[in-house]
């Protein structure tokens, strides 16, 4: 999960889903990882052109300091691998490109495992939080190649949501993995029958439904 900026109060889906799973007493072994840091300027802050070494050992050339969410998520994904998870799901208000591509009504989904993706898709339909799968093709990684590190933290102008997901995929290991980009859906400009105007909590219902489905 990644949250940031003045609207960070709207980003607590993983925490909410874990709380619900505990209250429902779901017979599952769950691990929730919430990488957190304070994003602010300072004498030791990241600068464009810096090269950082991630928890996984991979190096990243920082091309844009505003693409910081994927940096902390990369360490969260690498850390999650220590638990040898049956499945790995991350959720983040990650990219403005998601807003442009999908608008307010679809969660962007990427993944490496067909069974997991289909389970998440079905859970989204049941929960009223629909996902739309986007490609995770290797050709897009050309935009992330770096001369001084294993990869850059941002690509070019095109396909920003895809290159962000591809970046994360390099830290997800070989575990069945799904990434949900909720940047376009975490806020509603109007009241709906099931959501008040404002923060939507999008992804919480989907995650809970997915967890319930795993117990059936």
Where are the model-predicted features located?
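A generic structural signal for tightly packed, nonpolar segments enriched in small/aliphatic residues
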Residues: 1-216
